[in-house]
């Protein structure tokens, strides 16, 4: 009876693919709401284009076109001059989730999960029923035209039709065409136009063209010919890993011993550190064997203070025996490392001291390029920026914060906070983002901005990391990590001080202009009076007074400008 009931219960048991999961939960990828869904779709395609161009060393040219086909029904076209996609990878790139060139690597990139563009293809498929048309070539081969969809049950790309065309001109790049329904184009601060505008600011080396549904062409011209240096893959840091990381990496490594595996595949681990690790694991094993709670607490205190050799010595022969056992772990093949041993390694790492992880692999926008981007797109009267030194969060994940500030000029009244992660604009979920809280918690009145919400002020904040701590798979909000919050706050205060100095100089200049006009107003009257008293010609006296005023205010102007430039 029990068996038959169990059979009935498990009759509907089904293994769900990752594609099927995200088909049912598209909101987790950012496809929620008509406006946001369209922006997310464009974001995924443009991000792919920029990353591909930069990795291939090509200055990006990206063209986006939205054609209205009906009510809440659009055709989306995104074309780039990137390296193109080899024929055998087309189905995987556009039709298989959790597949890509970057998701498995510890490297800074705009996309992190290997879901992006395949998620867009799936969204087009489930809203319009149409496959996505891909036209691509690597330049040296034929042009491939393929209609791609996703088999959601298998999480596999499916090519419905494929045509090969001759390529006499050597065209190279990728063009994506997809039909989507249940979306809406609106020119708002969460729409496609604003997204592309913000993308152009943070990527001044990119040329971006946009054709709106009404046919209007908008061009965000390239303002820098300097291609960003490609980011470097970085080894994981001992303070930023979990047991599963070590265990899985140990199963895949080609290294012959646990010692060489740890030294070769993690940063800041040397032979000396391995010897230290052996001592910490030994000390932890011995402490766990101790039955008396008071003694155990005293030993843990000594462990925290780094007195591992004294702890081992206090156990006499038992300590030496455990030390020999742990040393053997370091010399065995990594594939034979047990889960418990991996746990011991991670636990020991927590008590050890390591140099901060190397940060050479991070690639910020850079102060000069931030200022070029803000100036070229926003045309302010004042612009400044700061790139903070690299730091780490969660003990071992490197990150860097940079902030740009633009004020006045063609900026309209109203504070604009431009949030970015690895150069990618974050348009949604601002309330839960650490960038918002850090920027808003500044007392702007201290920096001569009396009402920040009405000031013609734009603040760009970019968080750079090999692993940005997003709050969700939609990747629109950065989690509130204490170290990141503090770095943003310090960077914002830095540029705010520069703004205050500029505004102070501007106010003094206006005051001096007012004083000069007042003095000049009295020149004719004073000239007449002095002429009567001295007998000198009135015109000559007037000329002398004007010269005195000019010299006086010329020196004041120079002093104010020098202070503003400092």
UniProtKB/Swiss-Prot annotation:
PANTHER family: DNA TOPOISOMERASE 6 SUBUNIT B. It catalyses: ATP-dependent breakage, passage and rejoining of double-stranded DNA. The keyword Membrane does not apply. Belongs to the TOP6B family. It comes from the Archaea. Its EC number is 5.6.2.2. Relaxes both positive and negative superturns and exhibits a strong decatenase activity. This is Type 2 DNA topoisomerase 6 subunit B. Keywords: ATP-binding, DNA-binding, Isomerase, Nucleotide-binding, Topoisomerase. CDD domains: TopoIIB_Trans (cd00823).
